[in-house]
Regions:
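Extended, low-complexity, acidic/polar intrinsically disordered regions
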Residues: 1-476
Length: 476
């Protein structure tokens, strides 16, 4: 809003620069063209940031904001209100705190508390001004957007004054207002602390989880893990306990919401897994691994290693039980689940799985899948074998007989992708007899149509689906 010619010799480093800027902003704020006054509003935080931090700055800024609030142009009024968050933040290091007039302006109240009068119908002018502000979507959105900055400046001790306004906004009629609050919920929780967040923000989060606007729910879920980890542990576990039911019911047709939930599994594991007596986090993982959307299954697959590693550090027996549960995927009737098991085995081989656990738990499953007639499963199997070979645990001479039969089956496979991978192994396989190959499983009738859900309750049962799909690409 303020432009100065080079030959004016105007430098911000000069001692009189703040004074000259203050004089300039006063001139343009009095301009008869409303667009000039509007542009000047956006310069207010920058101009007053370099003014001496004294009582004069407080009084001048309040005076200017009061005048702009009463400007004849609604566009100028709105521009001034857009700056309210930045203007309030100017006092973040001021021992005297934020001027009460600016706080009242932010809350939609008359700037001067003494101006609140009884209107004669059971309300005050404060109440009516507040109601008028919240009925305006532009002003409500500005308040919602600036809430974190205001709380950061004023401090958590002033939350009781701001809480009623915040709670009203969480139920605002306009979606974009609720969406803005959902986006900053975790930041406000960080500013307030765990106790106040549990008391005041958890109810708001619950409303957003069931919001009529999916965008609001999606925005909340982007940082839901950060929000939960800021809560007391028992409250976080209560919140987690509700998620599987939402996945299977409210979010069953919204894959992007399920994807957001799945992405938070790794960040929740270190804090919640070992104290999650109900197994909700593992249930959430199983829901992701069984999802009909490939991207969500992939997220679940890559979350397995951190869960296995956490269990293993705590108790080897629990880790084996978790791995055995995942091995059940290898015997599932759906080829999608069988392929998922092979993807799990591959990522575990890349990171955490030891040779003894592999031979004891995973290798029998690979032998079972060697006879699988579905191309997707066969391709996933050869890539898993490639990962095993890259660990250099075995040579052609010392392979366990079960793994030898898997290798023989893959060498006998006529699928070009499988043949190319087997030929690319280093060192090359030698002396493996094709006669050791596992015979193919009995072919079952194909079942065509869209991918059906495999789960209908949080106990994670296998549905009795007889299928042996044939496909030439990755399943959806």
């Amino acid at each position: 809003a303020l432009m100065v010619e080079e030959d004016d010799g105007f430098l911000l480093g000069e001692t009189n620069a703040p004074v000259r800027l203050f004089e300039a902003i006063n001139r343009v704020l009095l301009d008869h063209v409303w667009q000039v006054r509007q542009a000047a509003c956006y310069s207010l935080p920058g101009v007053f940031a370099i003014q001496p931090h004294n009582q004069a700055r407080r009084e001048n800024l309040v005076l200017i904001m009061r005048a702009l609030k009463q400007d004849v142009s609604p566009n100028v009024q709105l521009a001034a209100f857009e700056m309210i968050g930045e203007v309030i933040y100017l006092f973040h290091d001021d021992d005297a705190g934020v001027p009460d007039e600016l706080v009242r302006m932010f809350m939609g109240l008359p700037i001067d508390a003494t101006h609140a009068v009884d209107t004669g119908n059971g309300t005050t002018s404060d109440t009516e001004a507040h109601r008028d502000l919240l009925s305006n979507s532009d002003y409500s959105l500005i308040i919602a957007f600036n809430f974190p900055a205001v709380i950061l400046t004023m401090g958590a001790q002033h939350w009781p004054k701001l809480r009623p306004l915040y709670m009203q906004l969480t139920q605002h009629a306009y979606d974009n207002v609720r969406n803005s609050l959902a986006a900053s919920l975790h930041e406000i929780a960080r500013l307030l602390g765990s106790e106040m967040a549990a008391t005041d923000l958890v109810p708001a989060a619950d409303r957003f989880l069931h919001d009529s606007c999916l965008d609001v729910t999606a925005t909340l879920l982007e940082h839901m893990d950060e929000f939960w980890l800021l809560l007391p542990p028992h409250i976080a576990r209560e919140q987690l306990r509700r998620i599987p039911a939402l996945w299977l019911d409210a979010y069953s047709q919204e894959w992007h919401l399920r994807q957001s939930l799945a992405t938070h599994i790794p960040s929740l594991v270190p804090t919640l897994l070992l104290t999650d007596e109900d197994g909700c986090l593992v249930t959430l993982l199983l829901l992701a691994l069984n999802d009909s959307v490939n991207a969500i299954r992939a997220i679940g697959v890559h979350a397995v290693p951190i869960i296995y590693h956490t269990f293993r550090l705590h108790d080897e027996t629990i880790a084996d039980g978790f791995l055995s549960m995942l091995c059940d995927f290898a015997y599932a009737p759906s080829s999608r689940q069988r392929s998922t098991f092979l993807h799990i085995a591959r990522v575990l081989l890349e990171e955490e799985l030891g040779r003894d656990r592999f031979e004891h738990l995973v290798l029998p499953c690979l032998l079972k899948l060697a006879g699988d007639c579905v191309m997707d499963v066969r391709i996933a199997l050869v890539r898993t074998f490639q990962q095993i070979w890259s660990r250099h645990w075995y040579t052609s001479q010392n392979m366990p007989h079960s793994l030898l039969r898997v290798a023989a089956t893959l060498l006998a496979c006529r699928v070009r992708v499988v043949q190319d991978i087997m030929r690319s192994l280093e060192p090359p396989l030698q002396g493996v007899k094709v006669s050791e190959a596992v015979p193919p499983d009995e072919r079952l009738p194909l079942e065509f149509g869209p991918a059906r859900p495999l789960l209908d309750q949080t106990t994670i049962p296998w549905r009795n689906i007889d299928e042996c799909e044939q496909s030439d690409g990755a399943s959806v």
